[in-house]
A protein has these predicted regions:
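N-terminal helix-turn-helix DNA-binding core of bacterial DNA-binding proteins
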Residues: 2-37, 59-72
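Extended rod-forming repeat segments used as scaffolds/tethers
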Residues: 17, 51, 79-80
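Alpha-helical residues within the helix-turn-helix
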Residues: 32, 43, 49-50
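Residues in the helix-turn-helix
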Residues: 40
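Core alpha-helical elements of the protein kinase catalytic domain
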Residues: 45-46, 87
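Amphipathic alpha-helical dimerization/coiled-coil segments
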Residues: 69-95
Length: 95
């Protein structure tokens, strides 16, 4: 989870994730929407890939990036577990 927290700590990486909510995109298309250098974008994409938040797939000479939805489900579950949210035993529900 430390890798995920580090990846999410940067506002540019969060902006990349918001852009990718619209769907799969090339690095060039992402770069067109951000005021950062392409080399900087590449570093941010690598951090997001290392955290398993983004999946990169080569299509010919182009690499396309998309959100790794399964990873977000795992992250949300881990945070909910950490906070004790959603645990029926904790809520005291009788049934």
């Amino acid at each position: 989870m430390d890798t995920v927290y580090r990846a999410l700590s940067d506002p540019n990486r969060r902006a990349i994730l918001r852009i990718l909510r619209r769907g799969e995109m090339s690095a060039g298309a992402i770069a067109d929407e951000l005021p950062i250098a392409k080399s900087t974008l590449s570093g941010h994409l690598n951090v997001l890939k290392d955290a398993n938040l983004v999946i990169a797939e080569r299509n010919g000479t182009t690499i396309r990036y998309r959100l790794n939805v399964a990873a977000y489900e795992e992250i949300i579950a881990a945070i909910m577990d950490l906070l004790g949210v959603g645990d029926a035993d904790r809520t005291g529900d009788d049934g």
